[in-house]
């Protein structure tokens, strides 16, 4: 595939509107939100920033992403488990890579992290459960050692 095609696909996917079944974000006092916030600060905020805004042309904004709060969290789970390679841009000719966290986070931690991301910065989405993460991890055959 040509680079222009890859960039067009990436742009399209980033612009898909959210399809959330939740009507209001979880409270910041919710235990899963607190646990997820701590993990986010430790592992994600350096690139995606505390406000979820990311860094233009380098690290995507989670706050502006419709797919973050989509009804089905499997794509988001996959990215966090396996990491992702960004397309090349003029600002980053090699294209930054998000590391895989599947080896580092257990199912409960990953569920808390994604629940936090899906309910922050104006998003309102159903919480991600340990079972959903476990099933996705199994389907993706990610080694946890």
Segments (PLM) and residue ranges:
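Flexible coil segments in periplasmic/lumen-exposed cytochrome c-class electron-transfer proteins
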Residues: 1-46, 88-145
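Sequence/structural segment immediately N-terminal to covalent heme-attachment motifs in c-type
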Residues: 29-57, 64-82
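A cross-kingdom feature marking solvent-exposed beta-strand/loop segments within repeated
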Residues: 58-68, 87-88, 95-97
């Amino acid at each position: 595939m040509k680079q222009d095609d890859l960039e067009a696909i990436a742009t399209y996917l980033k612009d898909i509107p959210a399809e959330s079944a939740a009507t209001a974000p979880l409270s910041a006092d919710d235990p899963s939100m607190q646990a997820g916030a701590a993990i986010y600060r430790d592992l994600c905020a350096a690139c995606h920033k505390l406000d979820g805004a990311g860094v233009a042309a380098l690290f995507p904004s989670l706050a502006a992403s419709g797919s973050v709060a989509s009804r089905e969290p499997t794509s988001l789970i996959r990215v966090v488990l396996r990491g992702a390679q960004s397309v090349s841009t003029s600002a980053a000719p090699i294209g930054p890579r998000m590391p895989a966290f599947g080896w580092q986070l257990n199912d409960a931690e990953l569920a808390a992290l994604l629940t936090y991301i899906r309910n922050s910065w104006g998003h309102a989405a159903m919480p991600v459960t340990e079972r959903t993460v476990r099933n996705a991890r199994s389907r993706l055959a990610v080694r946890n050692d």
